[in-house]
């Protein structure tokens, strides 16, 4: 059955979910398949987190953090995340930066400072946006909203593999604890808590390959009458 959601001339597909649910990889592959732009919103928060560490801004100082975010020079070029003109793509994937990103994302002022930057990614021919509030806050008119989930054990295993491949040390027990703490923090924050949009399609990736997850998203997009 085709969706009754109004067609937007610049369509957006949102893929939300918790840390290490596979949303970033799935979003990138869907975007590549469709020839759409890609927004990795988590990278924006990680860049803000890295800046807060560098400039020694405390994670509970909401006003100072919002001011810092407003003045950041952030760019994405050829898949690389740059802070003040320097490629920090690998640095922002460190666990310490990820934990700081989750901590500063609880502040409404920080999230508000990043809203316009995220919405500016919407350009023709379309956008695939991944994050935690893409379908609920940033792009509520998205033509397709997907909410990825996976067991915490599956997510910890994926995260461990990612970190090891990037040359970071990782401990499974610590990763499990960190993921549970992040889930609680992301789901219980007052500003844009992690939750599926009312019209989001749930996709549990625990037992799925990346290819199967991507094909399911594309199948849902085709059901809307869109070429995929």
Curated annotation (Swiss-Prot):
The keyword Amino-acid biosynthesis does not apply. GO terms for biological process: nucleobase-containing small molecule interconversion; pyrimidine nucleotide metabolic process. NCBIfam families: cmk. The keyword rRNA processing does not apply. ATP binds at residues 17-25. Keywords: ATP-binding, Cytoplasm, Kinase, Nucleotide-binding, Transferase. Its main location: cytoplasm. It is an enzyme of class 2 (transferase). This is Cytidylate kinase. GO terms for cellular component: cytosol. PANTHER family: CYTIDYLATE KINASE (PTHR21299:SF2), CYTIDYLATE KINASE/PANTOATE-BETA-ALANINE LIGASE (PTHR21299). It comes from the Bacteria. Its EC number is 2.7.4.25. Pfam families: Cytidylate_kin. The gene is cmk. GO terms for molecular function: ATP binding; CMP kinase activity; dCMP kinase activity. It catalyses: CMP + ATP = CDP + ADP; dCMP + ATP = dCDP + ADP. HAMAP family: Cytidyl_kinase_type1. Gene3D superfamilies: P-loop containing nucleotide triphosphate hydrolases (3.40.50.300). InterPro entries: Cytidylate_kin (IPR003136), Cytidylate_kinase_dom (IPR011994), P-loop_NTPase (IPR027417). Belongs to the cytidylate kinase family. Type 1 subfamily. It is found in: Cytoplasm.
